[in-house]
Amino acid sequence: MDKKFDSGKKEVLRARYEAQKIAFAPVVFQAVRLLRDLNILKVIEAAGKPGLKIEAIAEQTGVSCYGVTILCETGLSQDVLEIKDDCYRLTNVGHFLLNDELTKVNMDFIHDVCYEGLFRLDQAIATGKPSGLEVFGKWSTIYEALSHLPPKVQKSWFTFDHFYSDSAFPDALPYVFDLKPKSLLDIGANTGKFAIQCVRHNPDVHVTMMDLPGQLAKAKENIAAQGFGNRITEYPICDLLDSKAGFPGGFDAVWMSQFLVCFSEAQISSLLERAKEALAPQGNLFILDTYWDRQKHEIAAYCLINSSPYFTAMANGNSRMYRFSQIECLITKAGFRIESVDDGLGMGHTLIRCRTTSNSVCLSA
C-alpha cells in the first residue's frame, strides 16, 4: 500500500515537473538559442571533458559573467549542460543543439518566422486568419508575403522548407520518371528546385512551374542561372484559391510537393478538382508530403504536429499537418484512385501516385 502510494506520488511530481517545463518553454527556448548563437555551447564543446568555468566562457565569448551564468544555469536545468567542479560541459542534448542540422533549421524557423506571431495564435484560431503574420505586414497569407519579408526571415523560411523537401526529391524522381512523362506541371514550384532536378534527371521532359508571380520571379532567376530556360516555363497565377482560375492542361504528370498542407480541406478539394483537369487522359498526379501518422520515429511525428500552429498563426489561418487518412479521403472524393503509396522518402516523406477514376470511394471514411 505504502509502496503503491509512493510510486503514484512520484508520477504526480514528474507530471507537475513536465507541466512547469511547458510553462517556462519560451524562456528556455530563448536562453538556449543564445547559448548557441553567442558561441557558448561551441567553446564549452571545444573544452572537452574538463569543461569550462564561467570566467573562461565569458573571456572566450565576450559575454559578461552575469550573462553566461544566467544562460548556463538555464541550460543546466534543461539537460543541455552539466556541471562538475564549477566547470560546465556539453551533454548529448547540447551536442545536438549545436551540431544537428535538423535542430538548427527548426530553431531558426521558430525564432525568425514564428515566435512573435505565435503570440496571436488565439486570434488566428478565433478568426481563421493568420493574425500573427501582421508582425511583418499586411498580407492574407505568408505565401504572398515571402518575397517581401526581411532577408533573415526569408532565409529561415526557405531553409526550413527546402531542408525537408530537398531530401526527398532524389528519392522521388525514379517513381515519377519510371512512367516516362514528357510534360510535368509543378504546382507550387517555389524556387524551382524540383523543376531543375527533373530536367537534369530526364533529358526529354518539359516542366511548367505554376505559382504566385513573386515566387516564379525567383525561380526564373535560378533556372536561367542553370541554363534550363528552354525546358522550364512559368505559369503565374495570382490566386490559387480562385476556383474559376483554371490550370493549364494536357500534362502527363502533375506534381505537388509540400503543397496541400498549405490549405484547408475545402481548399484542397478545389485544388485537386482543378489538378484533375490539368492531366492528360492517362496522366498521373504525384503528391509528396509528410504525414505525422506515417512516421517511423516519434521525433518526426512530434516535429510535424507542432508545425501546425505555424500554419494557423502565420501561414493562412486554416491549414495544418494532416494525417494520411484525411488526405486519402480528399483524394478519392475528388475523383482519383490511389495507385501507389511509398513511405520513407527523404526525411519521412510519403509519395502518393493517383489517377483519375469515375468510381472513387473513400477507403478511410
Give names to the regions the model predicted.
Residues 2-76, 82, 178, 185-365:
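Alpha-helical subdomain
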